[in-house]
C-alpha cells in the first residue's frame, strides 16, 4: 500500500490524451481505438439493478438467504444421482419446466438445435420482409410474389384443376401400348425434385463416389411412404393398423382432390404397388452387387436389366445419354424394372402414378396440406401440430430459389468473425488431439493406421459458409406457389443435367421426402455441422456458430468444449466410422482396411450396440441400436477427444488440481445440459425406428460411462447404472 501524498507543483499536463470523462461510473477514453465488441466482459449491473426491488437495494440479507437455499437444495429428486443417471440428474428441472409455444409444436424433438433453427427461420423471414420494404427493384418484387405464394398457398380451385390435368396426363401415357411412354412418364416425374423420391426409380446427380471431384448420374430405389419398413412385411396387429392408416390417407387424398364419387381409382392400390416394389430387394438371380456402388453402363442397363437408360435420359432432357450410371442395388434394378415394365399401365399402377402427383398438389394447397400432415406428421412422426408459422414456411420454401440472397443477408446480420476464428482454432487443435489418439492406437495395423492419419491430416474444414454461391435466378415468380415451385425446379433440373460428368460445386438441397420438408445441403443458415465422406470435409454452418452452442462473452473453455467442441470431435470421428472409413483422404470409395482390422472394428461396433441396447432396455425401451452405430461411435470418440483437449489445456495453464476437478465437472455438466431434449408425446416410436442418433439420454450417459476421468471424478463403481464393463473409447 502506497501512502497518499500530495506534491506541490508536480502535476503534469496530459499532452498525449484528451481529458478522461467519468460517466455513470465508467471510465472512457474518447480517443480509444478498442472496439467494445472485442471485450468479452459486458457491462450489465446498471440495467440488472433496475430489476431489484427497492428493499433489495437497501438490504441484501433476504437475497443472500434465498441464494443459500437454492445452493443447498437438490436440483433433482433424491432418486436421481450422478452415479445412476447423469443426464436426468442435470436436466431434471429443464425437462420438467420446458414450455413451447403452439407455433413451435410442429417440432417433434425440442432441443437447442431445433429451437434455435426455429428462431433462425423467424430471422430469415424478417430479413426478407425488410428487404421488400426497403427496396423497389426486380428482386424485391420477386421476393414479395414468392413469399405471398407461400403464405397464401394454392387455392383449392386451382389445385383441383391441376389434379384433373395430371389424371389426364397419366391416362394419356398409360392408355398407350408404347413402352417408351413409361420412360417418358418416369423422366417427367424425376424432373421435379418435390415428387422424384416417390418414383419407382429415382434419378439424381451426385458426386461420383469413385471419382469424387466429378458428378455422375445415380439411380436410387423408390423412397417408401411408411417409415417403419417392417410394416410392409409384417402381418401383426401393429402392422395392419399402420397399413390401414396409410390406406385411409390415400383415400382422403383421392376423394378430396378429385371429388368423392367422381373418380374410379382404388386408393388401396398405392400400398399394393409399394409392397410389390419392396419385395424386389430380395429377388434372386443377380450376384454382381458389391456394396452400394454398382456402375452400370448404357448397354448393360438394357441388355442385362431391361432398364432403358437411353429413353429415360432423353425424357429427362439429355441430348446424349451418359455412358453409365451408378445404383445402390442391382437386385432392385433388375427385379423392379421387370415388375414396372410388366404392370406400368395396369389400373393398379395407374392409381400409383396419379398418387405421386396428387400428394405434391395437396402439400402446396391451403387446408389440403392437413391431409399430408395427418399421416406423415401426426401419425408417423408424432407431430403435435401442423406448422402454421408463415416465417417457417417462407424460409424453407424460399431457400430453394433465393439461397444466395438469404445467405448474404444472414452473413450480413449474423456473422461474427471472432467466433469463426475461435471455431477454426478449435477445429485444428481437436484434429491434432484426435491424430495423437490414433498414433497411440494399439489395435490398428501399421498400414491401416497410416491411412487413418493421412485421412485426418487432409480433412478440410469449411466454417460458416461456402466460398462460392451461384446467382439466384429471377424467373418471373407470381403469387401461385405450385407454378413458382415448378419454375425453380425446372431451372434447377436443367442445371443438374449440365453438371453430369463435370466438376462438383456446392448445391443447396432440400429433402422433400421428409415432413416437414428440411434443408439437406450446406446452407449457411442451417443450425448444424456435418461430415461429407465424398469430400473428406467438415462443414460447420454459420447458423450453428452462435449461442448457446458457442459463447464468446461469458463462458469458459469448458462450456465451449462441451458444445461446439464436442460437435467438432463428433464430426472428426465420422471420418473413421463405419461409413466414413470406406472413403480415402480424397473422398473416393477405397478399401484401405486390412481384413484383420475390419474384424476387430466390427467386434467393437457390436459391443457398442450392445451397450446402447442394454441402457435402453433398463428404461423398457426395445429398439435396434445398430441403425445408429456410426453416430454412437462418434459420440464416444468425441468425448475422448474433448477429455484429452481439456487435460492439455489445464497442463498448458498449470491449473491447480482443485480447479482441474471443478473444470472437468463443469465440462460434463455442460455436456449433459447441451444434450437436453424433450420428445413430443407420440414421437418416440418413429425416433427409435428412423433416427440414427440415439435418444439424448443415452448420447449423454454412454459416452460418459466410458470416460475414465468421469468415472473417477464421480466415483462410479460396479453396480452403479453409470458403470459399464469397459472404458474403451474405440480409438
Predicted stretch roles:
Residues 1-30, 50:
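Arg/Lys-rich, intrinsically disordered low-complexity tails that mediate electrostatic binding
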Residues 57-60, 270, 276, 295-307, ...:
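Intrinsically disordered, low-complexity linker/terminal regions across diverse proteins
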Residues 63, 119-430, 466-469, 481-493:
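Noncatalytic, helix-rich "gating/capping" subdomain that lines the substrate-entry/channel surface
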Amino acid at each position: 500500500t502506497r501512502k497518499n501524498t500530495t506534491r506541490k507543483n508536480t502535476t503534469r499536463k496530459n499532452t498525449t490524451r484528451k481529458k478522461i470523462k467519468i460517466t455513470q461510473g465508467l471510465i472512457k477514453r474518447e480517443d480509444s481505438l478498442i472496439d467494445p465488441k472485442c471485450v468479452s466482459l459486458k457491462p450489465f449491473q446498471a440495467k440488472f439493478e433496475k430489476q431489484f426491488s427497492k428493499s433489495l437495494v437497501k438490504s441484501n440479507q433476504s437475497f443472500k438467504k434465498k441464494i443459500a437455499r437454492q445452493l443447498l437444495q437438490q436440483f433433482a429428486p433424491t432418486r436421481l444421482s450422478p452415479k445412476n443417471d447423469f443426464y436426468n440428474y442435470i436436466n431434471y428441472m429443464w425437462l420438467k419446466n420446458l414450455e413451447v409455444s403452439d407455433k413451435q409444436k410442429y417440432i417433434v424433438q425440442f432441443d437447442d438445435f431445433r429451437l434455435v433453427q426455429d428462431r433462425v427461420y423467424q430471422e430469415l423471414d424478417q430479413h426478407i420482409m425488410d428487404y421488400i420494404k426497403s427496396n423497389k427493384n426486380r428482386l424485391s418484387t420477386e421476393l414479395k410474389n414468392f413469399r405471398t405464394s407461400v403464405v397464401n398457398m394454392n387455392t383449392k380451385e386451382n389445385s383441383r384443376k391441376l389434379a384433373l390435368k395430371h389424371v389426364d396426363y397419366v391416362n394419356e401415357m398409360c392408355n398407350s401400348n408404347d413402352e417408351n411412354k413409361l420412360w417418358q412418364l418416369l423422366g417427367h416425374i424425376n424432373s421435379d425434385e418435390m415428387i422424384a423420391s416417390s418414383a419407382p426409380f429415382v434419378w439424381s446427380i451426385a458426386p461420383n463416389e469413385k471419382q469424387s471431384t466429378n458428378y455422375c448420374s445415380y439411380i436410387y430405389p423408390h423412397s417408401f411412404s411408411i417409415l417403419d419398413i417392417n410394416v410392409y412385411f409384417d402381418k401383426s396387429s401393429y402392422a395392419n393398423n399402420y397399413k390401414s392408416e396409410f390406406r385411409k390417407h390415400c383415400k382422403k387424398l383421392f376423394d378430396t382432390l378429385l371429388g368423392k364419387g367422381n373418380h374410379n381409382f382404388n386408393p388401396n392400390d398405392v400400398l399394393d404397388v409399394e409392397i410389390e416394389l419392396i419385395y424386389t430387394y430380395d429377388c434372386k438371380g443377380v450376384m454382381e452387387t458389391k456394396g452400394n456402388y454398382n456402375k452400370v453402363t448404357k448397354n448393360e442397363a438394357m441388355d442385362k436389366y431391361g432398364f432403358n437408360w437411353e429413353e429415360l435420359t432423353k425424357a429427362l432432357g439429355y441430348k446424349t445419354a451418359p455412358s453409365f450410371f451408378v445404383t445402390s442395388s442391382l437386385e432392385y434394378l433388375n427385379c423392379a424394372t421387370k415388375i414396372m415394365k410388366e404392370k406400368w399401365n395396369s389400373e393398379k399402377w395407374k392409381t400409383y402414378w396419379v398418387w405421386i402427383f396428387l400428394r405434391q398438389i395437396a402439400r402446396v394447397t391451403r387446408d389440403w396440406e392437413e391431409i399430408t400432415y395427418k399421416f406423415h406428421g401426426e401419425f408417423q412422426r408424432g407431430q403435435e401440430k401442423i406448422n402454421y408459422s408463415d416465417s417457417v414456411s417462407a424460409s424453407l420454401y424460399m431457400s430453394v430459389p433465393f439461397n444466395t440472397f438469404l445467405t448474404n443477408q444472414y452473413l450480413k446480420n449474423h456473422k461474427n468473425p471472432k467466433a469463426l476464428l475461435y471455431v477454426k482454432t478449435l477445429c485444428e487443435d481437436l484434429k491434432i488431439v484426435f491424430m495423437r489418439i490414433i498414433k497411440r492406437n494399439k489395435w490398428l495395423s501399421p498400414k491401416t493406421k497410416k491411412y487413418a492419419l493421412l485421412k485426418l491430416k487432409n480433412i478440410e474444414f469449411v466454417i460458416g459458409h461456402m466460398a462460392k454461391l451461384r446467382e439466384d435466378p429471377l424467373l418471373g415468380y407470381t403469387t401461385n406457389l405450385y407454378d413458382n415451385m415448378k419454375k425453380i425446379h425446372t431451372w434447377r433440373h436443367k442445371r443438374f443435367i449440365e453438371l453430369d460428368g463435370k466438376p462438383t460445386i456446392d448445391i443447396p438441397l432440400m429433402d422433400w421426402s421428409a415432413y416437414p420438408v428440411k434443408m439437406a445441403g450446406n446452407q449457411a443458415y442451417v443450425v448444424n455441422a456435418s461430415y461429407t465422406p465424398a469430400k473428406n470435409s467438415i462443414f460447420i454452418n454459420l447458423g450453428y456458430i452462435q449461442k448457446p452452442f458457442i459463447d464468446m462473452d461469458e463462458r469458459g473453455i469448458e462450456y465451449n468444449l462441451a458444445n461446439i467442441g464436442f460437435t467438432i470431435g463428433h464430426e472428426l470421428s465420422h471420418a473413421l466410422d463405419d461409413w466414413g472409413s470406406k472413403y480415402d483422404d480424397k473422398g473416393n470409395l477405397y478399401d484401405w482396411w486390412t481384413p484383420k482390422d475390419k474384424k476387430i472394428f466390427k467386434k467393437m461396433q457390436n459391443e457398442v450396440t450392445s451397450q446402447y441396447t442394454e441402457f435402453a432396455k433398463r428404461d423398457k425401451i426395445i429398439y435396434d441400436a445398430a441403425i445408429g452405430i456410426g453416430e454412437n461411435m462418434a459420440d464416444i470418440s468425441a468425448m475422448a477427444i474433448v477429455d484429452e483437449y481439456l487435460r492439455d489445456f489445464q497442463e498448458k495453464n498449470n491449473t491447480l488440481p482443485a480447479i482441474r476437478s471443478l473444470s472437468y465437472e463443469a465440462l460434463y455438466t455442460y455436456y449433459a445440459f447441451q444434450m437436453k431434449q424433450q420428445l413430443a408425446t407420440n414421437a418416440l416410436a418413429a425416433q427409435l425406428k428412423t433416427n440414427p442418433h440415439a435418444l439424448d439420454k443415452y448420447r449423454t450417459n454412454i459416452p460418459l460411462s466410458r470416460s475414465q476421468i468421469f468415472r473417477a471424478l464421480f466415483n462410479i463403481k460396479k453396480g452403479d447404472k453409470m458403470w459399464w464393463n469397459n472404458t474403451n473409447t474405440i480409438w
